[in-house]
Design a protein with these regions (language model features):
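ATP/nucleoside-binding phosphotransfer catalytic cores, i.e., glycine-rich phosphate-binding loops
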Residues: 171-173, 177-223
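A glycine- and small-aliphatic-rich helix-loop capping segment at beta-alpha/alpha-beta transitions
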Residues: 45-54, 132-141, 200-202
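Glycine-rich N-terminal segment of FAD-binding domains in flavoprotein oxidoreductases
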Residues: 26-50
Length: 223
């Protein structure tokens, strides 16, 4: 699988924002899978600047921490701050994983699936919060976070002890049913795992490696 190497973070953000913009303009009723974290921040900033019409778009976030949704580091707060409060998307059109998790799957199915799913990748190869060892057939569920993920995400909290230990994540099987997937990665610390995931063995030990089996995946990287 080809990895598109871009010259800097600004180009990465602009390029993936172009993909989302095209999707929304050509298909106003689009269903999008949306990520959180550091990497997509530039993409969201670009999308806000472009003043797109989000009124018919439906979004499904990939994952959420099991924590108070009003906490400043909750992914609900993240999305409101970086995208939802700055666009005309209807609140009823933005969905986060919830319990019972089967009901979240039903919402995706009821919307006829995800058209475009945007992903990041963790240093251990996770996508969404599908940690190493996750079944390729997995659906939305509650998961325990890997020690590496907790350590990596501690930079967002006062201490590693404050990082939630559980999350609800869209499953690998759910993600793979998306019509198109775009994976973005930023930083030299992601290059090795990206190469392993995209060009190595397809194994549940590297959850992102399942993307090799999808027929419409684009990968973008900058250091």
């Amino acid at each position: 699988m080809e990895i598109n190497v871009l010259k800097n973070y600004e180009e990465l953000s602009s390029t993936v924002a172009d993909i989302v913009e095209t999707q929304i303009k050509e298909h106003p009723l689009s269903k999008l899978g949306l990520p959180t974290g550091d990497t997509p921040l530039g993409m969201y900033d670009e999308l806000v600047k472009r003043e797109l019409d989000w009124s018919l778009v439906i979004t499904f976030n990939l994952d959420v921490y099991l924590m108070n949704i009003d906490h400043p580091e909750s992914y609900q707060s993240y999305m409101r701050k970086n995208l939802f409060d700055k666009t005309n998307i209807y609140p009823d059109h933005s969905h986060f994983p919830f319990r019972p998790t089967s009901a979240f799957e039903d919402k995706i199915d009821g919307s006829m699936g995800i058209d475009l799913c945007m992903l990041g990748i963790g240093t251990n190869g996770h996508i969404a919060f599908n940690e190493p060892g996750s079944s390729f057939e997995s659906r939305t569920r509650v998961v325990d976070l890997d020690e590496q993920t907790i350590k990596d995400n501690s930079r967002f909290f006062d201490s590693v002890d404050d990082v939630p230990k559980q999350a609800i994540t869209m499953g690998l099987g759910t993600i793979m049913e998306s019509e198109k997937i775009v994976l973005m990665a930023n930083g030299v610390n992601k290059l090795n795992i990206l190469n392993v995931a995209m060009n190595g063995e397809v194994t549940e030990d590297i959850p992102a490696s399942i993307l090799q089996n999808h027929d419409n995946v684009e990968v973008y990287y900058c250091d």
